UniProtKB/Swiss-Prot annotation:
UniProt source species: Bacillus subtilis (strain 168)
Domain remark in the UniProt entry: Contains a small N-terminal 3-helix bundle domain and a large C-terminal TPR domain, connected by a linker region.
Mutagenesis / variant outcome for changing residue 47 to N: Loss of phosphatase activity in vitro. Displays reduced activity in vivo
Keyword check for Hydrolase: yes
InterPro entries named among the record's database cross-references: Bac_ResReg_Asp_Phosphatase, TPR-like_helical_dom_sf, TPR_rpt
PROSITE patterns cross-referenced by the UniProt entry: TPR, TPR_REGION
The organism's taxonomic lineage, starting at the top: Bacteria, Bacillati, Bacillota, Bacilli, Bacillales
Protein name: Response regulator aspartate phosphatase H
Superkingdom: Bacteria
Quaternary state and interactors: Homodimer. Interacts with phosphorylated Spo0F. Each RapH protomer is bound to a monomer of Spo0F, forming a heterotetrameric complex. May also interact with non-phosphorylated Spo0F to inhibit the sporulation phosphorelay. Interacts with the C-terminal DNA-binding region of ComA. Does not interact with DegU.
Effect of residue 58 to A: Decrease in phosphatase activity in vitro. Displays reduced activity in vivo
Length: 376
């Protein structure tokens, strides 16, 4: 009878697997995952290590869903199914395993655009952070927290965390994708501060790095973020130019990104009064929405149709704003209500315009109240 493989040896291999996941190296991660699964069949009994393995399967699938949304991998369980396997023993977990369980669950909630839920899990994970000794893992924590607070428009808190993450990533060349993503978050925060001149250099640096590593997805995302920055600064011409560049790369290389790009392009054209051209891109965007993960962008396209068609669909606008309210997406409420108000104001429907401007003010108040998310 062959001797059982020590669980410590399998644990080392799981650590290597996680390293490849954090580097977004799918082929290497797949190879190590298969090796770990084979070793576990011959491993000595170790319940903690099996939990660690389950957590890493969950994290592996989160990576795949981010890089290749909608793609299936044989009979593998989905993220939702994997979530059930890691939730069951959670109350028994301590230390590093508890940290991973909470941190990965926060990442899942973030991907579902449940940002308040995500921050709640990250805050619980932070209590276990003293058990984390690896610098890259600390950078991962700061990056994900910064990302969540950015989406909740808690700009100062986001900037505090992202600078800590970037300081680590920049010293590790293998983590160039996380460096690019960190530059995105910094630029987004500068945009929220309305310092557009400070945002663009970070986005251009991200684009240059993405081109250096020849990563089509992040080339497209960099172009998209540059376009969004120009749009926020009011430079419609430069925004449209970069949206179209992002759309070209997306159509050719990363089609799952196309609805997001076309939404940004459509909205900019609508605000610039080029609604006929915008509605062509809206139709193209809706045609590309098949996966459940794009439901959010379907709602946004429907919002544009409701606001900018010849007869404004006020009820539909209110329904969509209610959808955003349920998800605490106050920044989206602010931007969408502002667009609706501007359209009503331009057609001299001042009562409706005033009602939507009040929603803008309410959303701004809710964003400021969001500071309670990180009050201890």
């Amino acid at each position: 009878m062959s001797q059982a493989i020590p669980s410590s040896r399998v644990g080392v291999k799981i650590n290597e697997w996680y390293k490849m996941i954090r580097q977004f190296s799918v082929p290497d991660a797949e190879i190590l995952k298969a090796e770990v699964e084979q070793d576990i069949q011959q491993m000595e009994e170790d319940q903690d290590l099996l939990i660690y393995y389950s957590l890493m399967c969950f994290r592996h699938q989160l990576m795949l869903d981010y890089l290749e949304p909608g793609k299936t991998y044989g009979n593998r369980p989905t993220v939702t199914e994997l979530l059930e396997t890691i939730e069951t023993p959670q109350k028994k977990l301590t230390g590093l395993l508890k940290y991973y369980s909470l941190f990965f669950r926060g990442m899942y909630e973030f991907d579902q655009k449940e940002y308040v839920e995500a921050i709640g899990y990250y805050r619980e994970a932070e209590k276990e952070l003293p058990f984390v000794s690896d610098d890259i893992e600390k950078a991962e924590f700061h990056f994900k927290v910064a990302e969540a607070y950015y989406h909740m428009k808690q700009t100062h808190v986001s900037m505090y965390h992202i600078l800590q993450a970037l300081d680590i990533y920049q010293n590790h060349p293998l983590y160039s994708i996380r460096t690019i993503q960190s530059l995105f978050v910094i630029a987004g925060n500068y945009d929220d501060f309305k310092h557009y001149d400070k945002a663009l250099p970070h986005l251009e640096a991200a684009l240059e790095l993405a081109m250096d590593i020849q990563n089509d997805r992040f080339i497209a995302i960099s172009l998209l973020n540059i376009a969004n920055s120009y749009d926020r600064s009011g430079d419609d011409q430069m925004a449209v130019e970069h949206f179209q560049k992002a759309a070209k790369v997306s159509r050719e290389k990363v089609p799952d990104l196309l609805p997001k790009v076309l939404f940004g392009l459509s909205w900019t054209l609508c605000k610039a009064g080029q609604t006929q051209k915008a509605f062509q891109f809206i139709e193209e965007g809706l045609d590309h929405i098949t996966a459940r993960s794009h439901k959010f962008y379907k709602e946004l396209f429907l919002f544009l149709q409701a606001v900018y068609k010849e007869t404004v669909d006020e009820r539909k606008i209110h329904d969509l704003l209610s959808y955003f309210e349920k998800k605490n997406l106050h920044a989206y409420i602010e931007a969408c209500a502002r667009s609706a108000a501007a359209v009503f104001e331009s057609s001299c429907h001042f009562e409706q315009a005033a009602a939507f401007y009040r929603k803008v003010l309410k959303a701004q108040e809710d964003i400021l109240k969001g500071e309670c998310l990180y009050a201890y």
